[in-house]
Amino acid sequence: AAAALAKANDLPLPHLVPVGLHFRRRELFRTDQYIEFGEPIPLTDDMVPDDMVAAVKAGEWVEPPAEIVHRIRDELQTRLPPMTPEAATWAEHRAVHLTAHAEARAEGRSLATWQEEVLAARKVRDAWPGRIASFPPEPITGSRFDRANEAAELLEQRGLDGRDLGPRGRVFRKANLSHLPSAIASVALFLTLLPFSITSLGLQITLGRLLGDSTDEGLDARTSFQFLAAFFGSLLIWPVVAALWTAGVWFTHDRLASLFGWGSNWLEMGVGSTLVGLTVVYLLCFPVFWASGKSFAAAWDVWVDSKKAWTRSRFPKAEKARLERLLDELVS
């Protein structure tokens, strides 16, 4: 339709842009993401028949010829697979990513970002011995894959992955104690703002959970409902919660004045009107709700990092020794 409109108005024809959406674990909170844009696919005049242009000019619509649709589909099918995990199973996907980490580790490097990991894993996948690109992808086999798969599953069983590996000579990386002050500050701020977080974000999370549980259309649909609750919940829920907080301030303003040593008329804010003070309180609720959400995310990151650091330190010795041998064999 866009191409027909452009041709009808003597404008340049649009291009189709393949997009790769890469999520580490799409269903998890605070997961890593990398959005990749491929080379645009130009649309030519011969792909937009004159009858389509005439129909669009008349405010109507006709379907494009099947051969043009198939031509564009085939072009997309050629370009899109390399921008996906292109793995037969998730276990294979994990094995390839771990191999990318192992190779970087052997070279004295680390894959610091999800984008670096995705691109490095793609190089490993494309260069895998005996692999033939196909659609759908054929499973990777061989002794090297067996070692990579076993190593990846050892980590996966305990919630770890290639990011937890240490430099060559040490299986796991150590916790970065330089982050301890900021971690403590993040948790302290989260606890301070916890009442606001529970009353605002807590209701949004509950709404997302209820909407997600109400669908039987699979994990993607569940995540979509949760996204809608997160996106629109602040528009629907926060104004009501802010009004309740403002009412609470009004009913307890004498107690608050005594607690903080303020004057009894502190809500008038020097203008002689309590309504002004209540309006300011109401408006201040929104940035506080936002800050409570940011503090929750920061505290969540601290929890996840601390949990993984504990898991690394308590990793069974036998499995750790086996993992080290597998990693050495992967890059030997």
What residue ranges belong to the model's regions?
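Short, well-ordered amphipathic alpha-helices
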Residues: 1-7
